Structure formats: structure tokens, C-alpha cells
A protein has these predicted regions:
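Post-transcriptional modification and biogenesis factors for structured RNAs
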Residues: 1-196
Length: 196
């Protein structure tokens, strides 16, 4: 490995944010999933959860959309909502779904300096009632147009870059946030040598 490559892997890993994640529930289009993965990588989100309770497990992602982002992320696939939420609760203190409801908060009211998992539903019906009941609340992306929805990959990008803005302002990208063991594990997975 060249010194430049090692430096790049070190730099990227030191900016990974262990306290924010994306959950995609029954998203049909693999290209949408891939576009979300690309945004996760760009914003420093390491873990992404794919929950398929109504559709078959995804075997591949849309390569053109992801620019191979999947190989740099830790993808957790679940077919059972309870199991998925049990895992999420181990790492994230709050789980919010994207859903237009009376009690939904604005994206800009979320404190992204705290631990949070963000659930996005499928392209046709959004987040299911089951998942909304299991979550801690709902949020919406403020809009002023006629159509009150965004493509899932666009909604995810808007959301993650608000998280990025807040976390950047709070200094979360200024130093390593993942623990040393995870840093070394990912470095090795990404093709680095054992000694860091």
C-alpha cells in the first residue's frame, strides 16, 4: 500500500460518525439504495441498515448509482423488524422515521450531535405503521411545493447533509469518533495492513 493510500484510509476512517445511521425499509429500487449508500459514504456514515419485511433480500446494489460505495460501508440486512430494532437500540438512543404526521418535527429541529437512527420507507407507501409504532418519533423535511414528497435518495441526502452541517459545526469531524478496534477492523477490510 502506498503512503498516500494509507493516509487516505486513515483520514476517511477518522471522520466516520458512529452515532448516526440510515435505515431503509422495504426500498424496492436497488439504484435508490445505492444512491443512499453513496451519500452515507460522503457524509461519513459507516453503517446502513436494510430492512426487507415485504420484499426479497437484496443481493446486489445499482453499481452506477453507488460508485462502489457499498464496499466502504457496513451493510446490515434484516428481514425481521424486531431484530433490526433490537440491534439499532444497542447503538442509537433515538430512532426517527420520515413521516408526515401531526406530531412530526422538522428536520431542522433534530439534534444531530446526539445518537440517532433515521428510517426512510419505500418509494410507494413510505414507512410502515409497524415501524412508526416502534420508533421514537417522526420528522419531515420542510417543503413549500405542490408535491409533498421527495425521492428517497434525495430525502436522505438532504437529511444527512443537515446532520453533517450540525456535526461539523460541533467539531465531530475534527478527530476520530469510532473506537480503535473498529478503526483497525475497517482499515483491514478496506485493504490496509494490520499495523496502523
Amino acid at each position: 500500500m502506498t503512503p498516500e493510500r494509507k493516509e487516505k484510509l486513515d483520514r476517511v476512517l477518522s471522520k466516520r460518525q458512529p452515532d448516526v445511521t440510515i435505515v431503509l425499509e422495504n426500498v424496492f429500487d436497488s439504484h435508490n439504495i445505492s444512491a443512499v449508500m453513496r451519500t452515507c459514504d460522503a457524509a461519513g456514515v459507516q453503517d446502513i441498515y436494510i430492512l426487507n419485511t415485504k420484499i426479497p433480500r437484496h443481493k446486489k446494489w445499482g453499481a452506477k448509482s453507488s460508485s462502489s460505495a457499498a464496499k466502504w460501508l457496513t451493510v446490515h440486512q434484516f428481514e425481521n423488524a424486531e431484530e433490526c430494532f433490537r440491534e439499532l437500540r444497542k447503538s442509537y438512543s433515538t430512532i426517527l422515521t420520515t413521516h408526515l404526521s401531526d406530531n412530526a418535527v422538522s428536520l431542522y429541529e433534530i439534534d444531530f450531535t446526539r445518537s440517532v437512527a433515521l428510517v426512510f420507507g419505500n418509494e410507494h407507501s413510505g414507512v410502515s405503521d409497524e415501524i412508526r409504532e416502534m420508533a421514537d418519533g417522526n420528522f419531515v423535511i420542510p417543503q413549500v411545493g405542490i408535491i409533498r414528497s421527495l425521492n428517497i435518495s434525495v430525502a436522505c441526502a438532504v437529511t444527512l447533509y443537515e446532520a453533517f452541517r450540525q456535526k461539523n459545526n460541533a467539531g465531530h469531524y475534527n478527530g476520530q469518533r469510532i473506537d480503535d478496534a473498529r478503526f483497525k477492523e475497517l482499515f483491514k477490510e478496506w485493504g490496509g495492513r494490520e499495523e496502523i
